[in-house]
């Protein structure tokens, strides 16, 4: 997907990018490729692939949920900033918090935010399990997102504790989403969530399957969750 195809594909979905936003995506691509030589950020560095598999893929969340308002988003394990930085470029009024366990990635994100002239972005070098226990952040976000970080049973324990009541957890997954969801349902319910919608679609041009799962936060998460770092992955709630 060439940059101009990216702009056109979003336009078809009712998202019109300004020249500044188009330029921000191009700078993002350049910085990603340059920094990737010294920090492991992505296996995808070809321009056309970055535009479809990273940029377009991230913005698909906005096809199924309204981001056109002043809302706070926490992105767990964002790595190189996916999905929250592409969403922030498209919807500048969003308040973004990114949590990642690798310091080098946080350094990249701070640099990127400066280059892209982004405001209302905060980056935390922390484990999601510890961050979710922090009273300042626990149950404080309108939306929590994660993109292909872990399977649903694990992801729910990392993300749902951070979602405020009546907020939304948006999980961005690949082709295996429905199977993962079946296994993950006990965890979702235990942690106060309820599956609202699942959307499955193919990316344009290269046609790999994607799923977006919307989970609403109906009840407070029990205090014992998330458990200590490493345990959700080692002993998932299933």
Curated annotation (Swiss-Prot):
GO terms for molecular function: rRNA (guanine-N7-)-methyltransferase activity. Keywords: Cytoplasm, Methyltransferase, rRNA processing, S-adenosyl-L-methionine, Transferase. The gene is rsmG. The keyword Cytoplasm applies. Specifically methylates the N7 position of guanine in position 535 of 16S rRNA. Gene3D superfamilies: Vaccinia Virus protein VP39. It comes from the Bacteria. This is Ribosomal RNA small subunit methyltransferase G. S-adenosyl-L-methionine binds at residues 77, 82, 128-129, 147. InterPro entries: rRNA_ssu_MeTfrase_G, SAM-dependent_MTases_sf. It comes from Oceanobacillus iheyensis (strain DSM 14371 / CIP 107618 / JCM 11309 / KCTC 3954 / HTE831).
């Amino acid at each position: 997907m060439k940059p101009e195809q990216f702009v056109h594909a979003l336009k078809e979905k009712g998202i019109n990018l300004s020249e500044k936003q188009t330029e921000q995506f191009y700078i993002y691509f350049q910085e990603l490729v340059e920094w990737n030589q010294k920090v492991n950020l992505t296996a995808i560095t070809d321009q056309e692939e970055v535009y479809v598999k990273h940029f377009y893929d991230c913005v698909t969340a906005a096809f199924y949920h309204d981001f056109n308002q002043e809302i706070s988003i926490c992105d767990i394990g964002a790595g190189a900033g996916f999905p929250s930085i592409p969403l922030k470029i498209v919807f500048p009024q969003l308040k973004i918090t990114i949590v990642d366990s690798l310091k080098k990635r946080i350094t990249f994100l701070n640099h990127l935010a400066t280059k892209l002239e982004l405001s209302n972005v905060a980056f935390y070098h922390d484990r999601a399990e510890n961050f979710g226990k922090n009273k300042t952040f626990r149950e404080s976000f309108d939306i929590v997102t994660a993109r292909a970080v872990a399977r649903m049973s694990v992801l729910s324990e990392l993300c749902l504790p951070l979602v405020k009541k009546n907020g939304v957890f948006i999980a961005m997954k690949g082709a295996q989403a429905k199977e993962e969801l079946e296994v993950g349902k006990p965890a979702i319910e235990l942690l106060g969530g309820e599956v609202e919608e699942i959307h499955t679609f193919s990316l344009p041009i290269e046609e790999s399957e994607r799923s977006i799962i919307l989970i609403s936060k109906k009840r407070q998460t029990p205090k014992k969750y998330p458990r200590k770092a490493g345990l959700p992955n080692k002993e998932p709630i299933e």
